[in-house]
Amino acid sequence: MFSKVLVANRGEIAVRVMRACEELGVRTVAVYSEADKHGGHVRYADEAYNIGPARAADSYLDHESVIEAARKADADAIHPGYGFLAENAEFARKVEDSEFTWVGPSADAMERLGEKTKARSLMQDADVPVVPGTTEPADSAEDVKAVADDYGYPVAIKAEGGGGGRGLKVVHSEDEVDGQFETAKREGEAYFDNASVYVEKYLEAPRHIEVQILADEHGNVRHLGERDCSLQRRHQKVIEEAPSPALSEDLRERIGEAARRGVRAAEYTNAGTVEFLVEDGEFYFMEVNTRIQVEHTVTEEVTGLDVVKWQLRVAAGEELDFSQDDVEIEGHSMEFRINAEAPEKEFAPATGTLSTYDPPGGIGIRMDDAVRQGDEIGGDYDSMIAKLIVTGSDREEVLVRAERALNEFDIEGLRTVIPFHRLMLTDEAFREGSHTTKYLDEVLDPERIEAAVERWSPEAVAGDEEEGEVTERTFTVEVNGKRFEVSLEERGAPAIPLGGASAAASASKPSGPRKRREESDEGGQQVIEGDGESVAAEMQGTILAVEVDEGDDVEPGDTVCILEAMKMENDVVAERGGTVSQVLVGEGDSVDMGDVLLVLE
C-alpha cells in the first residue's frame, strides 16, 4: 500500500478520499487554489500545497502544478477524485510516465472509453446494445441532419469528452441544428479540451441506469449492482438511489452482465461506471465514466463495500478478494445532492456564507461534506456543497427517514435545493418510482417548486429580505429551570444570521439604471452609467460569449450573453426589446451578481 497520496481535487470528494486513505494508514496531501485556502479538504489533509489562482484552468486543471505539488510532498500516488482531471487521459499518462502511481484506469483505457464514438464501437463489438447514431465524430451540421433524416427528430449532439449534461444539446428541428452544433462544440472545448461531437437518436422518456464496476489488474471484473439516476434537471443528477425501483430481476441481471462484458473488452481496471438508458424494457449503452462517481455512496451503503478503498487497493496491485456471487444488495439507499442553487429560479447557482450549517444525524444517515458553519460558498466551482445519504431496509423506510433528515437539516445564508428535495418526497411520481429523466424539465409544474421554496426555505436567508417585510427572530430563554423558545416579529428589521455573522444588506433589486465599476487604464475606477435599461448578471460567473454588438436590435427573450456559473451555461436574455447602446463585458470576463453587462435604449 502507498505511504502518501495526493488528492488532485477539492471539496467533499477530496475529503472522502482522504478518509479512505486514513483508514488504510496512508498520509494525505491536498492541493488548493487561492479561493480554497480555507477549504475543508485543506483542513483535513496532512499537508497542503497552493497550486494557483481561483480559475480552475490555472490551478486544479494545471497538469504541471499538480504533479509538481506531488513531487514537493514526496507522494507516491495521485488520486483525481471526480471532475477536473479525473477523466483526462493526457494527465493520467503524464502521471504514469512520472514516478507516481495513477489511482484510476490506465490512460489507454481512458482513451478507448473517454471518446464516446470509440466507446460505442467497442461496446457494439462486445454485444452491448447502443443508441442508434454515429460511431465517428460529426464534422459538420450536415452530419447531424443526416442522422435526423435516418431516425427522425429529436436527436442529441454530444461532446466526445462530455458528461453530466455538459456538451449535450438536444435538437428538435432542422432550424436548431447549426446553433446547437456550435454550442456543443464550444462546451466540449471549454470543459473537456475536446471540440469533437457525435450524434445519436434522442430517447424521449428513458430511465438513467448505471452500473458500478470494480476491476483489478489480475483479470477480475465485478459489478456492484445498479443505481437509478433518473431524477435530473438540465441533465444534472439531483437524487440518486440504489437499487433501481424500475428494473425487473431479469433486466437487472442482463444490464449487470453487459456492463462486465464491456469493461472486460476495454481492458479496464479500477473503479468505473457503465451508464445506460432504459426505455420500454430495453437498455442502451450511453457511456463509461472512467472515475469514481458522485453517487458511489449509495452503492457502498447497499453492498457494504468501500469503493474508494478498493480504488486505492487495486492501484496498489491488490486482487479483488470477493467473487461476483459474493456481492449482495441489502436494503435501499438514496443520495440527495445539497446544491447551492435557487430551485425557484431554474436551479440558478447561489452564493453566500453558511451562517448556519447544522446537518442531520441518526440511524441510516450519512453526510459527505467538506464545509462548516461560517464558510464562504463562492461561484468558482461546482454548486454542490454536501451530500446527504439516507439508507434503510427498503425504499419506503428511506423515504420516511429522508423526510425526517431533510426537516432536521438547517442551512442559512444562501439558497439550497433542500426545499426541492422535500417537495420530491411528497411527489406521487417520485414516491412511486415512475419518474423518468424528463420529469423535472418537462412534467413537474414550476409553481410547485415555487410553493415548496416559500414553504420550506429558511426564514432568514442573508440578504434576501425586502424592506418592510416581517422578520422573525427566535430566542431561547430559561424560566425556573425550563427552556422556552420565544419568537418575536418585527416589520422592516434586517435579518440577523446565526453564527455571529453581521447583518446582511438588503438585496432588493433597484429600479432604473444600474452601475458597473471597471478598472480604467490608469488603474482607477470608472463608473459606467446608462439612461436605458440595464441587463445585469443574476449570478457570479464568467462570460463565455457575447451574442450582440453595440447598435444591434434585440427582441424580448433574445439571448445577449452566455454566462458560465458553477460549470453550467446560463443564457442571459433581454427582458424587453431595444437597441444595444453599450456592451460592457467581453468573452472571458469575470462578473459578480448585479454587474451590468450591457445597456438597451
Swiss-Prot record:
Region Disordered, annotated ranges: 495-531
Residues binding ATP: 148-209
InterPro entries, A to Z: ATP-grasp, ATP_grasp_subdomain_1, BC-like_N, Biotin_BS, Biotin_carboxylase_complex, Biotin_carboxylation_dom, Biotin_COase_C, Biotin_lipoyl
Assembly description: The propionyl coenzyme A carboxylase (PCC) complex is composed of three subunits: PccA (biotin carboxylase and biotin-carboxyl carrier), PccB (carboxyltransferase) and PccX.
Record field: compositional bias (Low complexity): 495-511
Ligand binding (Mg(2+) 2): E287, N289
List of residues that carry N6-biotinyllysine: K567
Identification of the protein by name: Propionyl-CoA carboxylase, biotin carboxylase and biotin-carboxyl carrier subunit
Upper classification of the organism: Archaea, Methanobacteriati, Methanobacteriota, Stenosarchaea group, Halobacteria
Pfam name, any one: Biotin_lipoyl
Domain Biotinyl-binding: 526-601
Protein's UniProt keywords contain Transferase: no
Gene3D superfamilies in the cross-refs: 2.40.50.100, 3.40.50.20, ATP-grasp fold, A domain (3.30.1490.20), ATP-grasp fold, B domain (3.30.470.20)
Residues that hold Mn(2+) 1 according to the record: E275, E287
